């Protein structure tokens, strides 16, 4: 488990609660790595999210271990403790984390910030959110049929975005990408520009909260409440969770 990203590489920071990490997280990371020829996707469980004062269901150590199990053996996927809880119990802010990561990159290294559509649509609420795309260009996984107007409307105050026709990262241009990617440019009032990458039509009908409900046996199938065994069987059948993660949840008695 790496504490920091390797120097001189093309890296995407992928922060989140990972409570628990599921197949949707992995699908987003796979798509980003293939589309933009990333060397590494850094999965970084967050210690304390400012916008979730109620905290997470599982503790930080459990979420780190589940994430490690989820990415184990997958080339280019690593777990980072860069967003670990602070000794002061202060919130973890994405901008501060990205600035720290970028400072550690050797010359020639590139840092991106990877997120799903839900995170992007809440970006306006993040601390100093208008600065984030200029520290680490955004890679956003959108839902099928997501109108571009929704993306424009979600931009932090003072930012605009336009399509960057024909633009393609140099590393990606060497080979046809395995996943479609659309390129844009984000501009701020100071005249600065930053690339923005959209992974369109990435269908992921899954959420961590739904998984937690399933584990608790809280979903209804039209007949009655599912038993605990039936809920866990459904998780396995539908491949919502990597098997090692589900085994860990069972062993630790999480989300009951």
Language-model regions: role of each:
Residues 1-256:
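Nucleotidyltransferase catalytic core that binds NTPs
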